Amino acid sequence: MMRKAVLTLLALACLLLDFENLEATAGNEDRILVVAQHMEAAFRKLEDYTCDVDQIFYQDGAENQRYLFKFYFKKEKKIRVDFYQPHSGLIIFYHDEEKEATVVPLRLLSGLKFRLSVDNSLMKTLAGQRINQTDMGYFIKFMFKNLRTVEQKETEFREDNERVEFLFWAWDYVEEKSAEKYRISISKKHWLPIRIERYNLEDRRLEVTDIRNYVLNAHLEDKLFVP
């Protein structure tokens, strides 16, 4: 009799734990959705922005390559990237819906230009990300899509007065073929990401991107995006 009562209590305890885990997961998904909605609303108000990006790629858990660049964006999807490291002086220009981007290898030799397909391997990051997948509008759509289609397994959500940080499960950013984890930090000042860490399912670090010095709605001139 006593054994049966103990087993019943254990079963109830397990059910309660499962319920709490489901509730926590659902709660985190709801909170991440609210963050994504804040980001979407903030992005709608943007006409342009610039930021400094420090992007590190890892191989076998160790730092492999590092890229430093300034990113310019103007609606509707005009993009300019000025590299500091490596390829100092290299500039990439891209306009929405175009199948090619313009590359200026050296800032001082602006007359020297190349047109390359956005699918060219030279125009992709080490993770395979294309130039037309680099703006915040694309990233926000990526978040909404994966909130609808991917279960948010682990529960990790932290918030203070300045930022929100959470663990986000998603298909890979580029081809959507392999599952990955992202640890994302969002500034509550402008509701844009300030740090994105990417991991595989074995918790091996793949990529870390720090985004700093946002300047929003600076009325960037169109000529800035002309090669």
Segments (PLM) and residue ranges:
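Gly/Pro-enriched, hydrophobic low-complexity segments
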Residues: 125-129, 133, 137-227
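N-terminal leader/targeting segments and the immediate start of mature chains
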Residues: 16-65, 77-78, 150, 154-157, ...
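Solvent-exposed loop/turn segments connecting transmembrane beta-strands
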Residues: 61-63, 89-90, 176, 202-204
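A generic structural motif
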Residues: 54-58, 82-84, 104-106, 171, ...
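Bacterial N-terminal signal peptides
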Residues: 8-18
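An acidic-aromatic
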Residues: 70-133, 204-207
